[in-house]
Amino acid sequence: MMQLMKITIKGNKLILDNDKIIYLTKEMFSKFDLKDKTSLDDETFYSLIYFRIKLSAYTMLAKRDYFKKELKNKLIEKIGFADIVKDVVEDFEEKGYLDDYEKAKSYAAQHSNYGTKKLSFILYQMGVDKEIVSEILEDEKDNQIEKIKQLWIKLGNKEYKKKIESILRKGFLYGDIKKAISSLEEEEE
C-alpha cells in the first residue's frame, strides 16, 4: 500500500511534517508537478529528494573534488535522508564523478611535504579504503629520505632537536629522519 506524505509548499520551500525544509527549484516544480500539492506518494517523494540531493552534489563537485565519505557526510548534514544520499553517492561513483583513488593521489601530491604516517592518518580520516592508501603511499615511501633531506636543509640553522621535532610533526618516521641526517653528514664529508 502506497503511503501519502503530507507536505506544505511556501514559496520555494517544501515543508515536511517534521518541519524539515527542502528548497525547491523551478525545474523541480515542473518536473514533479508540485503546484498546489498537499501530499506526495513515497515514490515521488524519493524521486524529489534524490533530485534535490543530486543538484546539491553537482553544485558541491563543481567547486572542488570530494572524497566519497566527505561528500556523503556534507550532503547528510545539509539535507538529511542518509539512505537517499548513499544512493546518490553510489550513482556518482558509478558515473566516475567521484574517484577516491585519484583524489587521494592528488591530495598526496599537493601535500608532498607530509610523511607517509601523516598522509595515511588524514586519508583514513577522509574515509579512503586501506588498499588505496597503501597503494598511494607505496609510491611515496621511496621519496621519504629525499623529502626529509630537503626539509632538513630548509630548516637551516635551527637547533638539532627542534629540526627533528618539526620533521616528526610532518609525519615522517624517526628512523627515516636518522637515515636522512646520516646521509647528509656523509655527503658533507
Swiss-Prot record:
Listed under GO biological process in this entry are: regulation of DNA repair
What positions belong to coiled-coil segments?
none
State whether keyword Cytoplasm applies: yes
Q: Does the keyword Glycoprotein apply?
A: no
**Cellular compartments annotated:** Cytoplasm
**Keywords (A to Z) from UniProt:** Cytoplasm
What InterPro entries is this protein classified in? Regulatory_RecX, WH-like_DNA-bd_sf
Q: Which domain of life is it from?
A: Bacteria
Task: Write down any Gene Ontology CC term.
Answer: cytoplasm
Biological role stated in the UniProt entry: Modulates RecA activity.
Please give the family membership noted in the entry.
Answer: Belongs to the RecX family.
Identify this protein by name. Regulatory protein RecX
Q: Which organism is it from?
A: Fusobacterium nucleatum subsp. nucleatum (strain ATCC 25586 / DSM 15643 / BCRC 10681 / CIP 101130 / JCM 8532 / KCTC 2640 / LMG 13131 / VPI 4355)
Q: Which gene encodes it?
A: recX
